[in-house]
């Protein structure tokens, strides 16, 4: 019985499925070993409901009530069981719930926004050919780095150790692509390195091991360690559902779950977006679009939950006041305020809050999107390309973005919502808007807008940022107005796609 008890304990804490997986221990060690008290063997860390964890092993033959999983799957803690070494969890991709041993889990870590984190740790920038040779010592077949070309500015050089030599391959620019042999073309350096790591093609040997630039960390290794690196083989890409300045947004499936995928192919931009993706790993809230993970392939794939009913502007325009009641507008506004209150509490500034960046789920929950990417998109943009009609005067004039400038944008978003998706400042050019707002002009409330909502809008548009309310106060006032509205929030009739919307969403 003692041996059986040991097996159960090992399964509970290490997730093994069979006795064959247990480590072999010498009899001498067993005679000398005294087991610690049970309390010492129990996990000391207690995970609260909502904590995301990564599975450390595979469990394909679950007993009734247990959850099947593969190594590296993401689950969310629902509750701790009375037996403290077990949790009831929900699987991120399948949506199934079940029991899982604590020892088979490790907490999913938020990724640090570390300037040393690099998608291209093998890129050494401006170094000479001689310096590259020194870096690739001692000789090792397949050891490589990429540098900028000294002789041909704008081009790159792939340096590969082979035998006792270092071979230098000039990387040419051709019609927006990169090539070494003018036969195979790549969209960026990451794509090129990925290709030659699998197939030597026109070069001397496959790329085996990158020579990391001093002071950098591999983003791929850090993403994998923290539990955010997803497997490309499990991703199926579908139709394009949107397009931003830096790449397309595609619909897709990851292990059977519908997802939205932002594909960023420019390696410099991908590096900037990596920093903001690190921010997204820290943010977990019902009213924020959830990051599922990242795939490194020909650039960067940012995989997010798919929010089925699209952005709030189109949702309201295609239904109008005949189908969407005031209570539902208040509900959407409250959802956005609560999502922004959470970001405000984390000291994160969105910078591009607008109804186009709010997505609506199947059960009519409004979710703030692009909250982690807005800062990356601002890099490389001048003030003439800011969303003028949504941007606070101090941000337009001095580039000063704060939570208070987000509050200004929220006031414009309220105007969009209660006008059922109309463009703000109708019939005014961007120059006219900027000048008029500077002189104190504020929009009139949309037709049918409740008085208290107009008061809220006006408070968001105070010229002095300090006088604008925090999102916490905005959420409180919207919740109060929703309660006083009396009628339940509702969207009547059919959606634009022909499916029936829920008729009632209780506040």
UniProtKB/Swiss-Prot annotation:
For this UniProt record, the keywords arranged alphabetically read as follows:
ATP-binding, Cytoplasm, Kinase, Membrane, Nucleotide-binding, Phosphoprotein, SH2 domain, SH3 domain, Transferase, Tyrosine-protein kinase
Q: Which reaction does it catalyse?
A: L-tyrosyl-[protein] + ATP = O-phospho-L-tyrosyl-[protein] + ADP + H(+)
**Membrane-spanning residues where?**
none
Q: Where in the cell is it found?
A: Cytoplasm; Membrane
Q: Where is the composition biased (Polar residues)?
A: 491-507
- EC number(s) of the enzyme? 2.7.10.2
Instruction: List each copy of the SH2 domain by range.
Output: 122-211
SMART domains given for it? SH2 (SM00252), SH3 (SM00326), TyrKc (SM00219)
Asked if the record carries the keyword Amino-acid biosynthesis, the reply is no
Gene3D superfamilies assigned to the protein according to its UniProt record, in alphabetical order:
SH2 domain (3.30.505.10), SH3 Domains (2.30.30.40), Transferase(Phosphotransferase) domain 1 (1.10.510.10)
The SH3 domain covers which part of the protein?
A: 48-110
Q: Which residues form the active site?
A: 352
Leading EC class: transferase
Q: Name one Pfam family in it.
A: PK_Tyr_Ser-Thr
Which GO terms fall under molecular function for this chain's record?
ATP binding; non-membrane spanning protein tyrosine kinase activity; protein tyrosine kinase activity
Q: Which CDD domains match?
A: PTKc_Chk, SH2_csk_like, SH3_CHK
Which residues are reported to carry the modification Phosphoserine?
501
Q: Give a short account of what the protein does.
A: Could play a significant role in the signal transduction of hematopoietic cells. May regulate tyrosine kinase activity of SRC-family members in brain by specifically phosphorylating their C-terminal regulatory tyrosine residue which acts as a negative regulatory site. It may play an inhibitory role in the control of T-cell proliferation.
Q: Give the family this protein belongs to, as stated in its UniProt record.
A: Belongs to the protein kinase superfamily. Tyr protein kinase family. CSK subfamily.
For this entry, the protein name equals Megakaryocyte-associated tyrosine-protein kinase
Query: What are the leading ranks of the lineage?
Result: Eukaryota, Metazoa, Chordata, Craniata, Vertebrata
Gene expressing this chain: MATK
């Amino acid at each position: 019985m003692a041996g059986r008890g040991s097996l159960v304990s090992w399964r509970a804490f290490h997730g093994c499925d069979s006795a064959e997986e247990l480590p072999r221990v010498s009899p001498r060690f067993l005679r000398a070993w005294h087991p610690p008290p049970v309390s010492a063997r129990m996990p000391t860390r207690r995970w609260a409901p909502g904590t995301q964890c990564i599975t450390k092993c595979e469990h394909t033959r679950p007993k009734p009530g247990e959850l099947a999983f593969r190594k590296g799957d993401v689950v969310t803690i629902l509750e701790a069981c009375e037996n403290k070494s077990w949790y009831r969890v929900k699987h991120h991709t399948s949506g199934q719930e079940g029991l899982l041993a604590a020892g088979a889990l490790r907490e999913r870590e938020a990724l640090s926004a570390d300037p040393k984190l690099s998608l291209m740790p093998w890129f050494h920038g401006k170094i000479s050919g001689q310096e590259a040779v020194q870096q690739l010592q001692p000789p090792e077949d397949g050891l490589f780095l990429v540098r900028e070309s000294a002789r041909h500015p704008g081009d790159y050089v792939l340096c590969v150790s082979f035998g006792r030599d270092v071979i230098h391959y000039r990387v040419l620019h051709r019609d927006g692509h990169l090539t070494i042999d003018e036969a195979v073309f790549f969209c960026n350096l990451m794509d090129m390195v990925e290709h030659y790591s699998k197939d030597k093609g026109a070069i001397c040997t496959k790329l085996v091991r990158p020579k990391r630039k001093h002071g950098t960390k591999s983003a791929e290794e850090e993403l994998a360690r923290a539990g955010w690196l997803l497997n490309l083989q499990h991703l199926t890409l579908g139709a394009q559902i949107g397009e931003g300045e830096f790449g397309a947004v595609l619909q897709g499936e990851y292990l059977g779950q519908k997802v939205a995928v932002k594909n960023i192919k420019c390696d410099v931009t991908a590096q900037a977006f990596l920093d903001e993706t690190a921010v997204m790993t820290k943010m977990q809230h019902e009213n924020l679009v959830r990051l599922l993970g990242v795939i490194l392939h020909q650039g960067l794939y940012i995989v997010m939950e798919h929010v089925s009913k699209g952005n709030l502007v189109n949702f309201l325009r295609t239904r109008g006041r005949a189908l969407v009641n005031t209570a539902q507008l208040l509900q959407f506004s409250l959802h956005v305020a609560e999502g922004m209150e959470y970001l405000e509490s984390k000291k994160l500034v969105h910078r591009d809050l607008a109804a186009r960046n709010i997505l609506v789920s199947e059960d009519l929950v409004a979710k703030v999107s692009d909250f982690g990417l807005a800062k990356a998109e601002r890099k490389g943009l001048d003030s003439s390309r800011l969303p003028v009609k949504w941007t606070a005067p101090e941000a337009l004039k001095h580039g000063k973005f704060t939570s208070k400038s987000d509050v200004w944008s929220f006031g414009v978003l309220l105007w969009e919502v209660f006008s059922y998706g109309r463009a703000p400042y109708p019939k005014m050019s961007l120059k006219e808007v900027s000048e008029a707002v500077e002189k104190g002009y504020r929009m009139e409330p949309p037709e049918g807008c409740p008085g208290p909502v107009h008061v809220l809008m006006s408070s968001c548009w105070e010229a002095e940022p300090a006088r604008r309310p925090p999102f916490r106060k905005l959420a409180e006032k919207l919740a109060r107005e929703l309660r006083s509205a009396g009628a339940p929030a509702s969207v009547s009739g059919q959606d634009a796609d022909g499916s029936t919307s829920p008729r009632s969403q209780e506040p």
